[in-house]
A protein has these predicted regions:
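RNA pseudouridine synthases
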Residues: 1-199
Length: 199
């Protein structure tokens, strides 16, 4: 039966099941034959990773042409001002491509208080302030969010995917390294597709 799994991927875990010499992989966290990641999450990024055993669902969740949004919380160097936020929202040229318009906002300290400590902790320079921003995109090019924040002068220190395809990590209450199975009707993008197919 087609299914979807939501995992809170910890920092340092490689987004594959096959063994790797240098990093732990998804196999160290879950044993789910026939399930594969719907999209990827860099080894040094954390947060929501969706996995499925259904090829069409995998495509619908991960491929930009279907418009599935992904939301990230990025801890960046410096005090991000209005100009940088507007540039990210409009889209920036990164050399090989120009990003589509994004939704972007500064996060308050009270919002990020829900986050878990990263292991190992990030390297913070005492003389340089940092802050958190939220970015929602629908593309997902290689290291896109990190490249975007660096382009506007704010290198990324920590990156967490908090939502994808209508699934919110905080709603699931998953601690790092834990996972849960989702029903199709809990994944809004797939539920909408199923409704269209039955009409």
């Amino acid at each position: 039966m087609p299914g979807v799994i939501a995992l809170n991927k910890p920092y340092g875990v490689l987004c594959q099941f096959s063994a790797h010499e240098a990093h732990p992989t998804l196999a160290s966290l879950l044993d789910v034959p026939e399930y594969y990641p719907a999209g990827r999450l860099d080894t040094d990024s954390e947060g929501l990773l969706l996995l499925t055993n259904h090829g069409p669902w995998q495509a619908r969740i991960s491929q930009p042409r279907f418009g599935a949004e992904k939301t990230y919380w990025a801890q960046v160097e410096g005090d991000v001002g209005a100009d940088a936020l507007q540039a990210l929202a409009r889209g920036v040229t990164l050399g090989d491509f120009t990003t589509a318009p994004a939704r972007v906002r500064r996060l308050a300290d009270e919002e990020t208080a829900v986050l878990w400590p990263r292991v190992p902790p990030i390297r913070v320079r005492k003389t340089v302030p940092d802050c958190w921003i939220e970015l929602t995109i629908h593309e997902g090019k290689n290291r896109q969010v990190r490249r975007m924040t660096a382009h506007v002068g704010h290198p990324c220190l920590r990156l967490i995917r908090v939502a994808a395809a209508g699934v919110n990590l905080f709603d699931l209450g998953l601690a790092p390294g834990t996972w849960c199975a989702l029903r199709a009707d809990e994944l809004p993008l797939l539920a909408a597709q199923a409704r269209r197919q039955t009409q």
